[in-house]
Amino acid sequence: MSIEEIPEEIPQGADVTILSKNEKKARELIKKLHLKPVPGITRVTFKQKGNLIYAIEQPDVFKSAAGTYVVFGEAKVDDMNKRIAEAQAQQEQQEALTKAAADAETADKSPESITNDLQNASLEDKTVEEDEGEVDETGLDSKDIEIIVEQTQVSRAKAVKALRAHKGDMVNAIMELS
């Protein structure tokens, strides 16, 4: 009998998980402890100091008679600050699209208004370009700058400027840029 002759019992596209030897042993021990499975839980999170969150998607959760829980699943580190920043960026983008759609309906299409719009856009680009130039980082720790850029999602130049304004104090620089 070859592998081609074995009938497939698993439908295509099904989510199949392969358990390790240690996990199989642990599950057998759980069954011996008479723990009851808790259905309907889609995500378990454990919060640690400093907004560090361990998240387990699609966990297998069991409850003991004493009220303690046993959770099986793959734990992944989840950064809430990054999630919040992504959600805010998406919301701002959505608001900008709705505002642009509303402005497009009411905008004047005369040649003068189009020229004014182009001039305003070119002025905005120049201010951004000036901000992105070479930045003097002497006296500042590059790790501090990278942390501020990561936390506040601003350019490196703005992070350096904020650090200099607060004499190297990262907390106040982040608060200013947030």
Curated annotation (Swiss-Prot):
Highest taxon in the source lineage: Eukaryota
GO CC annotation terms, alphabetical: nascent polypeptide-associated complex; nucleus
Residue ranges with Acidic residues bias: 127-139
InterPro entries: EGD2/NACA0like, NAC-like_UBA, NAC_A/B_dom_sf, Nas_poly-pep-assoc_cplx_dom
Bias (Polar residues) ranges: 112-122
Record flagged with keyword Protein transport: yes
Span of domain UBA: 140-178
Region described as Disordered: 87-142
Residue ranges of domain NAC-A/B in the record: 20-84
Principal subcellular localization: cytoplasm
Keyword Protein transport listed: yes
Keywords linked to the UniProt accession: Cytoplasm, Nucleus, Protein transport, Transport
Physiological role: Component of the nascent polypeptide-associated complex (NAC), a dynamic component of the ribosomal exit tunnel, protecting the emerging polypeptides from interaction with other cytoplasmic proteins to ensure appropriate nascent protein targeting. The NAC complex also promotes mitochondrial protein import by enhancing productive ribosome interactions with the outer mitochondrial membrane and blocks the inappropriate interaction of ribosomes translating non-secretory nascent polypeptides with translocation sites in the membrane of the endoplasmic reticulum.
Family membership noted in the UniProt record: Belongs to the NAC-alpha family.
Protein's name in the database: Nascent polypeptide-associated complex subunit alpha
Organism: Meyerozyma guilliermondii (strain ATCC 6260 / CBS 566 / DSM 6381 / JCM 1539 / NBRC 10279 / NRRL Y-324)
Gene name linked to the record: EGD2
